[in-house]
Amino acid sequence: MGLPHTTVLIFGLLCVFQPSHSSSDNDFTKVRAVNLGGWLVVEGWIKPALFDGIPNGDMLDGTQVQLKSVGVQKYVSAAGGGGGSVAVDQDVASSWETFKLWRVSDSEFQFRSLSGQFLTRSNDDVISATTDSPGDSETFFIERNNSLLHIKLLNGSYLQVTNNNQFTSNYRSQPGWGDGMATFEMTIVANYLHGDYQLANGYGPVQAKSVLTEHRKSFVTVKDFHLLSQSKINAVRIPVGWWIAYDPDPPAPFVGGSLDNLDRAFHWAQ
């Protein structure tokens, strides 16, 4: 079946604007299109304010960080980029000293090394990067004072540096910010992932639903479609995420509702 003569399409998903009765058959001889990015797929560079309310918003899922001991002034380093021992012995940070955050909550994180293994605690309290699938032993509470961190295991013990540059988890008391052996300075190397996953994971399910519902309702409206039509725009590209196929209950942490908004776009285009 061929496309009808229209005044506007949506493609990729593709939306079609219904022409007025006065439109001629030549109205659709040339496609004039715009992209409605940042609406049903979040793009932080388009609307960064969406992320403003996230606690520890500079530590979103996927952020790359480096950790430097305040006490010995050396960086935490996974030997070989991961898969083995971890020491606090490097004067200059590079890829072996860079860890990708997996965000569990606003204060719980997992640290993934360059080769894909996670920081983990062994039975002798030594930290290594040897686990491929993170669990409780790879999950750390972060206590933060600007760029300074205390890193705590679920059992209450804190990570520290020993005098021989070992990275251990046997600091049992509450460290102060002047305690250099259990205090680390965090440098954010890359924080460029600002999509639906980071937003929903950062806010949590309840607040993320509220934020995205308001955004989807107000970012693009029927008035915008009317303006496009009046401006002789006859095609609109609306990016959608793969999780729309599972609407209204997409896998966590994604928030349902984008399919309803896409349906509205087709209705507005009639």
Question: Where are the regions a protein language model picked out?
Answer:
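Eukaryotic intrinsically disordered and solvent-exposed regulatory patches
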Residues: Q18-S20, W96, N146, R264
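Structural signal for hydrophobic/aromatic residues that build the beta-strand cores
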Residues: V34, V76, L119, L159, ...
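Aromatic-lined substrate-binding rim segments of carbohydrate-active enzymes
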Residues: V220-Q270
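Active-site-proximal beta-strand/loop segments in catalytic clefts of secreted hydrolases
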Residues: V34-W39, V70, P239-W243
